[in-house]
Amino acid sequence: MEKPRRKKRWGRRKVRWAVMGVCMVFVCISFVVSSIWSDTRRFSKEKGRKAQVSERTFGPAEKKRPETEKTAEPTTEPTRKPVDKTLQIYTYLQGPKSWNQGIDWSGEWGESYMDGGSFGGFGCGLCCMANIYSSLTPYQCSPVDMYRYAKKHTGYGGGMAIDWGYIRRGLTSLGLHCHVERKQETYHEFRENIRKSKCAIVLVSSANSTVHWKNTPGHYVTIFEFQEKTDKVFLADSGDPDHNRRWIHLKKVYRSLKTASNWQYLVISGYDKQKDHWHHKMANGTWNRPSYLKAKS
């Protein structure tokens, strides 16, 4: 009769190894958990330290700006260009050559005969009057308009150069304050008169000086915008397109004043609209109007 088999039991050695294995597993798990906890704690400490540094640097209420954010540059207004007053100064030309060449400010009147005389030969004074009236008042006229006005209101007969008396009488009736002058003994006195004026009509002659005008027995021109720093004036010369609308030194004008005439120049000191009996609104006739000249309302 067979004996019943006994169940095998683990030996002491095997139990010892099992216990050691369990302990090693527990130690490994503890090490891993400890490492993770340590890293987490160290990360939180570093984060807290950075926050403290940030607060010390930027203050508690100030947040550090992103690196990509740029400081807005201050806006600057564009510099405005100074207004060129000469663009609204009228500078009519009187002769036929200017008209045939199509030069700005020339007109058909350059080829016209009026009361037996060629306007291109005698119209310089009337161009000066038209320049002044159109430049200093809200109104405008052409040299032909001024010719007709002077004939009707001043006693000027037409067909020839206009004299100082008719020029002064005509401009006064248009509300312009003006008076005639003789050449002063010194340039300083002449300069002071021009400095205080709005503009002036001057009578020049190459018989007195050829510093600027050649072959010119007698010729009316207009001068505007005296510059105190340079002693220059803006010249309106109806007889020469190369002279017209140029800046020249006032001393050249002074030296060229025609002393053979009773009067050498006429100064304009102001304008009174209420004393203007004309209020002429159109520059009539066929002429080459510059593109830069603004239309008057």
Language-model regions, residue ranges each:
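N-terminal Lys/Arg-rich, disordered targeting/topogenic segments
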Residues: M1-V15
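Solvent-exposed loop/turn segments at secondary-structure junctions
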Residues: N131, Q140, K152-G157, E185-Y187, ...
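Active-site-adjacent substructure of cysteine-protease-like catalytic cores
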Residues: K183-F234
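Noncatalytic regulatory segments and standalone regulatory/sensor domains
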Residues: F226-S297
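Stable alpha-helical elements in mature extracytoplasmic
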Residues: G120, G125-M129, S142, M146, ...
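Active-site-adjacent structural segments surrounding the nucleophilic cysteine of cysteine proteases
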Residues: K14-C23, C28-G157, K294-S297
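Mid-length scaffold segments of soluble, non-membrane domains
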Residues: C141, R148-K183
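Extracytoplasmic/periplasmic, Sec-exported soluble proteins
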Residues: G116-G125, P138, G158-D163, R182, ...
